[in-house]
């Protein structure tokens, strides 16, 4: 108990004295720490108050105390050195040199300028592209307008052409021939003249037919029996017509009338000698008349052919009828001759 009291009294005394005289390690550099005197009373008091105060028997065990003191100082130096090095690094990291600061500022400024230039270039490109698009749209619109105008002009020209073509419709002449433009205007008076010339020719042919029918009826009345059909003189006239290729409708009517009598002659008796003489005389008269008629018809046909070629193209089909009827007249002539011979 006495020992404990004495130790407690000592510690109380040392604590009072330590407050006054405390060894400050923070004020020392690493070199100063290395040169500290380990036997310094201040240091010892500090150690006793601090890290070595836990050991109660430190005064009695001197050897142990010395070992602990050495280890403490070694670790202390290491800690101090590390702390000092840490402080230096912190200061170096926090403090920036002006040169480095200027370089950093230059770098930052250059980066900003590059960004601004890039944005300017992008804006210029976008503007150029927008202008190109606008120009393309304008060109497309102009092309579309030109195309529409061209189409409108084409439609107008087509309408004009259609109107002009409708005005110039091919007119059919009296001969059913298509005529257009100025040709129709030039040929129309010719066709009119030809039509006018054909009318008197048709009238003449009708008059000739009437006269021929009257003469035939008179000749039939004179003869007591029906006369055989006329054959020889019309055949010669038909040969002349085929050579000239111009005949009238009058000969057709006369030939058709000549075809009818054979039917009646077949039912009657053969003619007598007096009737044969009268028949021969009538045939001579008829042949003379037919030749004169054919000569007149040829002159008329020449005039008609000089006036218009189109009428001459329409007349041949009528002539073909007369040409077909003539062989029938020949056969009709032969039949009564055979009957007469049999009758004799």
Curated annotation (Swiss-Prot):
Residues 191-200 have a biased composition (Low complexity). Residues 265-276, 331-344 have a biased composition (Basic residues). Residues 95-344 are annotated as: Disordered. Residues 103-123 have a biased composition (Basic and acidic residues). It comes from the Viruses. Residues 135-155, 244-259, 281-314 have a biased composition (Acidic residues). This is Uncharacterized protein L201. It comes from Acanthamoeba polyphaga mimivirus.
